[in-house]
Amino acid sequence: MPPAGIATHAMAAYDTAGRLLPAASGIRLPAYGALLCPCNVFLIGISKMIERFLTQTKFTSVEDFKQNLHFKVPDNFNFAYDVMDAWAMEAPDKLALLWTDDEDNCIRFTFKDIKEQSDRAASYFSSLGIGRGDVVMLILKRRYEFWLSMIALHKLGAVAVPATHMLTTHDIVYRNTSAGVKAIICVGDDYVLEQVAASRKDSPTLKTLVSIGPNVPEGFHDWHKEWNGVPPFERPGLVNDNDDIMLLYFTSGTSGEPKMVAHDFTYPLGHLTTGVFWHNLSEDSIHLTVADTGWGKAAWGKLYGQWFAGAVVFVFEHQKFTAEKIMRKIEQYRITSFCAPPTVYRFMIHEDFSKYDLSSLRYCCTAGEALNPAVYDRFFEFTGIRLMEGFGQTETTMTLGTMPWMTPKPGSMGMPNPQYDIDLVRADGTSCEDGEKGEIVIRTGKGKPLGLFKGYYRDEEKTRQVWHDGLYHTGDVAWRDEDGYYWFEGRIDDVIKSSGYRIGPFEVESALMTHPAVVECAITGVPDDIRGMVVKATVVLGKDWKDKAGDDLVKELQNHVKHETAPYKYPRIIEFVDELPKTISGKIRRVEIRDKDSRKKD
């Protein structure tokens, strides 16, 4: 159901460069049309928007970026008022959000629409008793109500807790009790509604449940039925201080329950570098990031940095991922900027590119795990576009990246984002030399940089474990080359120690990925009485190779790795599987493979 004021009908749609979008059956557009104005109308607005928060807005080199990136942080900064409402005032008819789904339904929101609808949502939430400091969980998949809810909660000074739709009742209860969740706003899917409803009896702080439909069971408020009658929104007096908590993300480690990553109201400012520089966005960009709203990558690629730049956030609500679906949407809606984890690109390069017109693409980025050079090379061969890698965590914004003024080195994460003081350290805390592997840390002796989390909510001990002596420890291992580029090796827990050698999973995975049989692979360590650990490869084969799985192919792949990298790294064990275990954001879960192997041994 479209929000109030949005009609459902078919009409022509245009992108930000004025190009006609392909007609779609049942396309949904604002009743008042709101087709885009010419791009140059917004050039001054974009410059003024970014100039409010940066002392310099254009950079031409690594040194220029390093020396001259400086932020202007307003008191009581609030992204909803200081950016989104400002856009609505200065460029009300500019397209802000373009939402579509598997059936090619399409809803467009201008910045004026976002203001009006988020105001209405804020008034509605306020009528339900939600206010400053209240914790609200959002289980909204890729529904447009997620963006309205986030902006509305910011306007109230409330704390948003984005969550995945795959949570069980146990998961939800844990989150409710750990964070003190007061309200849950969720999709009207039967599974989600059942889990949310069942969590209520064991969640003493949980007072309010809201469904966005179509199903609204007893005990749930009906968003689209109830919010039409709310009074006009009036901005509260003091909504927030800069150090108030704005956002909580639950992030899993290798053991124990998920930790609560707490970000304050300055966190969106940290994503200026993500959207404006790493994604290289401008007012005529239509940007698609492949990420579910329940994970931190949505904040990276579908919200803050993109709207600082005045770009269109493109949202594709799909039931099941396929590379074909994504590529069709890029073609159909003339996407100009694209970001996805390497897993997505691995599947894309196995498609027939001659079937798609991807000529609208100007810029592509990747993050989430290391990019295999073979994938970079094939994607460049097919599109002529260089994949620009980046690195960060739920606890940070973009920490390392390949910027537009840099020459990418396939497989490298790029160089440090100068808003962070990055170093590589040994186990004793001393700095590594070039070429030496160490842990990526952020030095915080001069204060917490923009974008870095406040700590793990309500857990000082876990915070101290990773943040002490003026260093935030990422737990990720890398090395730096003589040009200052960083190269990912793996999580500290992923590094394999075999016969005295330290073997990073990524270097072996990259070697395997150059063999035509391999679509995906994961390298893990398996305990061995003689060597301590041996290297194991879990491999997904291409469809033309599946019937060749056997001892001969195992030997061929082992010899291939010996040829591509140092022979001591070759996988002594190879297992063929149909798919690898992954997080919803596309990261390979090597810990799950290790746990499975451990159970087999027991």
Range-by-range predicted roles:
Residues 107-112, 246-270:
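Conserved AMP-binding A3 loop
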Residues 212, 563-587:
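AMP-binding/adenylate-forming catalytic domain of the ANL superfamily
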Residues 93, 97-151, 168-173, 225, ...:
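Conserved AMP-binding/adenylate-forming core of the ANL superfamily
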Residues 92-95, 210-221, 228-250, 257, ...:
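Conserved pre-ATP/AMP-binding loop-to-beta segment of ANL
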Residues 167, 173-175, 184-189, 338, ...:
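AMP-binding/adenylate-forming catalytic core of the ANL superfamily
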Residues 224-225, 308, 335-340, 349-409, ...:
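Gly/Ser/Thr-rich phosphate-binding loop
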Residues 269-286, 293-336, 351:
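Conserved AMP-binding/adenylation subdomain of ANL enzymes
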Residues 32, 40-49, 151, 155-225, ...:
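Structural core segment of the AMP-binding/adenylate-forming
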